[in-house]
Amino acid sequence: MYFCKRIKKKGMTEKENTTLWSENVIVVDAEYVDRVAFNLIVNFERMLGRKIPAADMARWCDCLVLDGGIPSDHPEGIVSVVLIHEKDSAAFENFVPASYGELNGKAFKDHLGEFVFSAVAVEHLTTKDDLLLDVAQSVVESKEVKRLMVVPNSEDGDCYDLLRQMLRRAPDDKRITLFAMQPMPGGNFHQEILGYSLMQALGIRAAELEDPPPSPSL
């Protein structure tokens, strides 16, 4: 899959090109999902007895939107992917492509639509959780958006609980999906297990899990 610089729409200002939401939006806590990917790599390399490559970003995004309700036989146009990361962090360690600078403003296109990436660094006056909540709320309030998929840090802090509270007021015509590594308290949204999409992106096949290689004898 090739990532290329996205061409801005003619007749639109710089602000309009960068602030309008598409019908489908993915919002991600970048360091959190990178940490989860690392843990999966370590565990499955031990279990399967083979090297696990870095997660394929394009493949992961495809799996997210399928879990988020986009039909595989009905492409939905543009998908905005917002990667929220700490200011002192320059890249993923367990995804390819990895660099936030290289991903920002880039896009790839496949049978599910055009995925347009924005990498947003957290400034000193806010926190990553607060920024993610602000972005998610902006998306929910946007009339253009039909589907929102959020990957928050559901293991540390109260970001997940604050999202639950905020989404109580979400319009019924939006499909909202939160991703976590285990079932979490529900609300006005769908839930999906984050590990399934990451396993696909890491190239871990279901058949391998059904018949893993024997552990080496001591």
Cite the ranges covered by each PLM segment:
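A signal for specific C-terminal beta-sheet/loop modules enriched in small/flexible residues
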Residues: M1, M47-P53, T177-Q182
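Nuclease catalytic cores that cleave nucleic-acid phosphodiester bonds
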Residues: D110-L218
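Short, flexible coil/linker elements and helix-boundary hinge sites characteristic
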Residues: Y2-K5, G49, V65-G68, K143, ...
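Domain-level signal for Mg2+-assisted phosphodiester chemistry and nucleotide/NA-binding surfaces
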Residues: R6, G11-V120
